[in-house]
Amino acid sequence: MLTLTTLASGSSGNCTLLSDGETHLLLDAGISCRRICTALAALKIAPESLSAVLITHEHSDHISGLATLHKRFQLPIYTSPGTARQLCYRIAALEDVVRPCPPGNSFTAGGLDVETFPISHDAAEPMGFAVSDGNRKAALVTDLGVVTEAVRRGMAGAQLVLVEANHDVEWVRSGPYPYYLKERILGRQGHLSNEDGGALALGAVQSGARTVVLGHLSRENNTPQRAFNAVNAILSAYGPREAGLTLSVAPRDQTGPVYTV
């Protein structure tokens, strides 16, 4: 059995817990260490019992709590070599605990197998993760401007997926952001729109996913209902929704439900 719980998911902070009941993995640490510890306590998990922290990339909404988390608990950190260099440049104390893993490779953390795959984002060497207990698989991918074959392969066969639905394209285009920021968001190294996230979710469902969680929504350029409606329409357009298929949106600033596969 695998469980996934988002502690925060959005442009202002991202942190997710994956667990099989014995091995607990934290994916990103983009909220304060205090918030992480409070959320874990509510789930009856001691922070020191975490097996590892997995970091997708070095942007602040994914690592803002990492320095304090390391200072208190000295947990092993798995990330790509490029991200590892960025982390150690910013937080020298991490050099002893960072374990680089090139995208496309895999490793074992506690009792869980972790696959990595490259993603397209404006960071040093970003990557997504897929975690398996040998029978069940969960895949998580946000912060990407385009869905590549490597992403599809990495997510294939996952029963539970967390995918990005960052923005409504027309809201970005007509909104107050400066031109360069609009181009960044909409570009190939930016973020997935609701429609792009829906297409990715559809592919995941067609390869076995039964739980789809939408994450990393923009506060300014999206709403949970708008993201849900857009993705639900894409899933429904390819036939009646399959029995047992769950679609939901991760909360931005609070702990979400515990999803189990």
Please provide the spans of the model-predicted regions:
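Conserved beta-strand hairpin/beta-sheet module of binuclear metal-dependent hydrolase folds
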Residues: 1-43, 127-143, 160
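Active-site environment of divalent metal-dependent phosphoester hydrolases
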Residues: 60-63, 84-86, 124, 146-149, ...
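Active-site neighborhood of phospho(di)ester-bond hydrolases with catalytic His/Asp-centered motifs
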Residues: 27-30, 51-58, 78-81, 139-142, ...
